[in-house]
Amino acid sequence: MTCGLVRIRLARFGRKNSPVYNIVVANSRKARDAKPIEVLGTYVPVPSPVTKRELKRGVVPIKDVKLDFDRTKYWIGVGAQPSETVTKLLRKAGILNDAWATSKNSNVNRKVVFERMETLE
């Protein structure tokens, strides 16, 4: 899979030990926190705290993700390549299907293909 010039990736903001990420469209050659082309949403990986009473009731702490679906679909349609972490988020959001290839998956698939070719020979 070739990497395009435009990527959808995470840009870190927030304080020390309290990360907040912006989901941004940026030039792949720019620094992580450089000015992006467009901000698509936010991702807070630390779950919001719940009280003991809520824990007893079975309330599960959740991670906050806010995303502009229309703009994200537009950028993917134009050819922007999401990073691996953003790909996972977009799969959970239902924007990408499970067949979407990442560089990590394609390397694993190549190894499996080569192993099968060796066993067939």
Swiss-Prot record:
Entry's Gene Ontology cellular component terms: mitochondrial inner membrane; mitochondrial small ribosomal subunit; mitochondrion
Q: Which UniProt keywords apply?
A: Mitochondrion, Ribonucleoprotein, Ribosomal protein
| Lineage of source species | Eukaryota, Fungi, Dikarya, Ascomycota, Saccharomycotina
Q: Which domain of life is it from?
A: Eukaryota
Q: Which InterPro entries match?
A: Ribosomal_bS16 (IPR000307), Ribosomal_bS16_CS (IPR020592), Ribosomal_bS16_dom_sf (IPR023803)
- Give the UniProt family note: Belongs to the bacterial ribosomal protein bS16 family.
Locations listed in the record: Mitochondrion
Q: Which gene encodes it?
A: MRPS16
Summary of the function given for this chain in its UniProt record:
Component of the mitochondrial ribosome (mitoribosome), a dedicated translation machinery responsible for the synthesis of mitochondrial genome-encoded proteins, including at least some of the essential transmembrane subunits of the mitochondrial respiratory chain. The mitoribosomes are attached to the mitochondrial inner membrane and translation products are cotranslationally integrated into the membrane.
Q: Name one GO molecular function term.
A: structural constituent of ribosome
Amino-acid biosynthesis as a keyword of this entry, yes or no, is no
Subunit field text: Component of the mitochondrial small ribosomal subunit (mt-SSU). Mature yeast 74S mitochondrial ribosomes consist of a small (37S) and a large (54S) subunit. The 37S small subunit contains a 15S ribosomal RNA (15S mt-rRNA) and 34 different proteins. The 54S large subunit contains a 21S rRNA (21S mt-rRNA) and 46 different proteins.
Name the cystine pairs: none
TM annotation in the entry: none
Q: What is its main location?
A: mitochondrion
GO terms classed as biological process: mitochondrial translation
Q: What is this protein called?
A: Small ribosomal subunit protein bS16m
Question: Which HAMAP family does the UniProt entry name for this protein?
Answer: Ribosomal_bS16 (MF_00385)
